[in-house]
């Protein structure tokens, strides 16, 4: 036996480098093959394959952690109800006369854009909506809290950041009061966004009786492979009838009248009408994914009644975008279509301007066609590295005739 053991040890010492090399080679081939077959962006595929082969073993590990989108396969099982909502919204679709009056004749550029976006998103255009812009937390938070206080059936709230500060606590109190009234309440916070406050407000919500969940908390080991897949959606839907969405997180810094330590300028929207059903459906899918609970029943039915009758309503369509989309390039197609349809002007406002080549080229082509293209960026940014990267890209649009404007402080997250 000692002789056999010694022989096995000697055999292993002799062969382990070859076995390890073969294993790394197989993993490298598998990872690079996956990247080539799955990645739809050619540059992304080339970059991942380069990393995988130039850093054997380590590159494949990094690709497995950050390069594989696991959300799509899980979320695809939760989309059946989205088709049902789209069917229900067909009754709220504008007729031909309404489209002619608002968007133009069938040959008009905006009509072709409407058709394009419908085909890309597979979500119908809804009529008879009311959309009200709300500037910052000073305008938006009181209206949102009033909507929560008036809820009679359900409240769905999703936010990337939900700080444990005076504003956050005010929302907790309003949500807790709704629970005590018998309202169905669900709150979804991103796993990384929740960590902006320490300790997280999650425990305070749960102590107040509010059903809350984190979207892919990175503190849980099994969710580590999802670390780069975040939920930045900001959604509030009350009774399936009144919705809010935009750029506002829930944090005291968005209340500029309070002179916060880290002020943030932002814009939010109050939405009434059939399109609110699309907002609610996105939340229901996100909640089912994160909390493993399917929200159903009368409390979670969308109210498809018109918010505005006649010709004063707004045509609207909710376009979802995120790592759970089966076609991650759909937003690029929508933007490219919009820029191609532009006749007079294009106004772009974003806190983080990092467009890919396709969007840059579409902006440049629009400017060279004589369209006025204005890009508004924050004068100061909360992410220094992103600001540097954004500034380094501006020459690509400036030299083709686009105009770039910088807003004064505070940081503009609009």
Model-derived regions: residue spans:
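A general structural signal for well-ordered alpha-helical packing
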Residues: 332, 339, 360, 373, ...
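Active-site lining segments that contact anionic ligands and/or coordinate catalytic metals
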Residues: 313, 343-345, 372, 399-401, ...
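C-terminal structural cap/anchor segments
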Residues: 383-414
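N-terminal localization/anchoring segments of enzymes in phospholipid and broader phosphate metabolism
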Residues: 1-333, 337, 341, 365, ...
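Helical hairpin unit composed of two closely spaced alpha helices linked by a short loop
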Residues: 342, 352-374, 378, 383
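A general structural motif
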Residues: 137, 323-333, 354-358, 385-386, ...
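Short, glycine-rich nucleotide/cofactor-binding loops
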Residues: 161-166, 349-356
